[in-house]
From Swiss-Prot:
GO molecular function: glutathione peroxidase activity; glutathione transferase activity
Pfam family, one: MAPEG
Membrane-crossing segments per the record: 5-25, 79-99, 109-129
Name of the protein: Uncharacterized protein sll1147
Species whose genome carries this gene: Synechocystis sp. (strain ATCC 27184 / PCC 6803 / Kazusa)
Example GO biological process: leukotriene metabolic process
GO cellular component labels: plasma membrane
Lineage: Bacteria, Bacillati, Cyanobacteriota, Cyanophyceae, Synechococcales
Length: 137
């Protein structure tokens, strides 16, 4: 596999990192807007939703990024990038919805979670398949 074949997953990784940076900045802006100064993490529901988006996205990145790269390497980098783009869309919809109301976050959460699960399970199955092929020789 060449570096060129991995450009799309690399782009998705860079975009996911940029998305996370924007979410971190949003927390800083929300702190100022709602008067919740560090180290406090509670005190205003609107602020707490903005903070929760950032926390949850960090949690999801720990699952998403390994899945993206393992799928790209052991299955298909183009499909990995497409699923990664779906994850990004899901995270954006999740943030947009959650910023408005907790009840509005589920579509984005489901979209992001489903794409992550496909990446991780697909990567695992591809790795197991390749290990099985090696053991047959």
């Amino acid at each position: 596999m060449t570096k060129t074949e991995l450009l799309w997953p690399a782009l998705i990784t860079a975009l996911a990192t940029m998305l996370y940076l924007v979410l971190v900045i949003n927390v800083g802006r929300a702190r100022a807007k709602y008067g919740v100064m560090p180290p406090a993490t509670t005190g205003n529901e609107d602020f707490e939703r903005v903070l929760r988006v950032q926390y949850n996205t960090l949690e999801q990145l720990a699952f998403f990024l390994p899945g993206l790269w393992l799928f790209a390497i052991y299955r298909d980098p183009t499909i990995a990038a497409i699923l990664g783009a779906v994850w990004l869309l899901g995270r954006i919809l999740y943030a947009w919805g959650y910023y408005q109301a907790a009840e509005k976050r589920m579509v984005g959460f489901a979209l992001g979670s489903l794409s992550s699960m496909i990446l991780v399970v697909g990567a695992l199955l591809s790795i197991l398949w390749q290990l099985r092929q090696l053991s047959q020789f």
